[in-house]
């Protein structure tokens, strides 16, 4: 605040409010510093487009709405002054009415200045982080309300990563099955087998592979809602070992410990399952019958 004498009376007014008016006015630098300290920026990065100013009644917007007659009279004055900016016309009006302004009662300018006014504005790179616009607020709220768990992850992760994770156990299972049968063949089946093998015909295995590829293709191009019916993917059976089993059993028949073997769909449909025969005191062996030869007899 600064004290001025108007009409023999001492009055107080904001420091540097009227530069160059009256006898004891402050310098232009002091007035500029005083005005700058009263700016409360609502947007960062040096943008004062939506900034407010500190007044004796709190923060106020710099934008002023005028009535229709006042706006017409004001723009007429601006046109007569020949200035392009409305603020230039306002400054001319304040200087012209300096005597009348000094006669007004003084203001209580003991208000506290904002803490951010004395600090330099942040760089323009931080605009997206500290902006208080409605768009940024809605974006921050949407990010804050987003789920944090990995179970409901992004659509791309659900589409690709889960499919990849589901295919790894299947590949490991297929490799383990092939290794097991290879080890069993090298041992020449010394111990009696006590398990049941369900082999799948080649044409059925091929149709299931086609169905699997079609399911994966539909899952990749579908939406998240449509993929709900396709998830989780159905378990895939191990690869067909039917030709391998036929060749192995034809070379060395295996002993059966009470359970018959069921083999379906031979090559060309010629081979079929046959009941076990009892020989040598109840010993059962697997025998492959040729029904064509049997029909001839």
UniProtKB/Swiss-Prot annotation:
GO MF term (any one): DNA-binding transcription factor activity
InterPro entries recorded: TF_TCP_subgr (IPR017887), Transcription_factor_TCP (IPR005333)
Renumbered residue ranges of the record's region Disordered: 116-136, 273-297
UniProt keyword annotations, A-Z: Activator, Developmental protein, DNA-binding, Nucleus, Transcription, Transcription regulation
Location of the protein in the cell: Nucleus
Function recorded in the entry: Transcription activator. Binds the promoter core sequence 5'-GGNCC-3'.
Subunit structure, as described in the record: Forms homodimers and heterodimers.
Name listed for the protein in its UniProt record: Transcription factor PCF8
Organism: Oryza sativa subsp. japonica
């Amino acid at each position: 605040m600064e004290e001025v004498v108007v009409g023999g009376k001492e009055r107080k007014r904001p420091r540097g409010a009227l530069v160059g008016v009256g006898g004891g006015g402050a310098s232009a630098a002091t007035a500029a510093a005083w005005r700058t300290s009263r700016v409360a920026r609502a947007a960062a990065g040096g943008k004062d487009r939506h900034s407010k100013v500190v007044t004796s009644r709190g923060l106020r917007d710099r934008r002023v709405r005028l009535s229709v007659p006042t706006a017409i009279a004001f723009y007429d004055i601006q046109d007569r002054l020949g200035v392009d900016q409305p603020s230039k016309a306002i400054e001319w009006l304040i200087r012209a009415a300096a005597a009348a302004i000094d006669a007004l009662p003084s203001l209580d300018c003991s208000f506290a200045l904002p803490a951010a006014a004395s600090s330099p504005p942040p760089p323009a790179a931080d605009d997206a982080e500290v902006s208080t616009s409605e768009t940024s607020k809605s974006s921050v709220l949407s990010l804050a309300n987003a789920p944090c768990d990995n179970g409901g992850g992004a659509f791309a992760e659900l589409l690709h990563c889960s499919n990849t994770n589901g295919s790894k156990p299947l590949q490991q299972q297929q490799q383990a099955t092939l290794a097991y049968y290879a080890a069993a063949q090298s041992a020449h089946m010394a111990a009696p087998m006590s398990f049941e093998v369900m082999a799948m015909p080649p044409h059925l295995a091929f149709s299931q592979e086609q169905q699997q590829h079609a399911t994966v293709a539909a899952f990749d191009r579908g939406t998240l809602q449509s993929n709900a019916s396709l998830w989780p993917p159905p378990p895939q059976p191990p690869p067909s070992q039917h030709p391998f089993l036929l060749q192995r059993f034809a070379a060395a028949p295996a002993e059966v410990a009470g359970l018959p073997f069921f083999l379906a769909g031979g090559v060309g449909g010629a081979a079929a399952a046959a009941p076990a025969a009892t020989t040598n005191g109840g010993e059962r062996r697997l025998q492959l019958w040729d029904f064509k030869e049997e029909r001839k007899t």
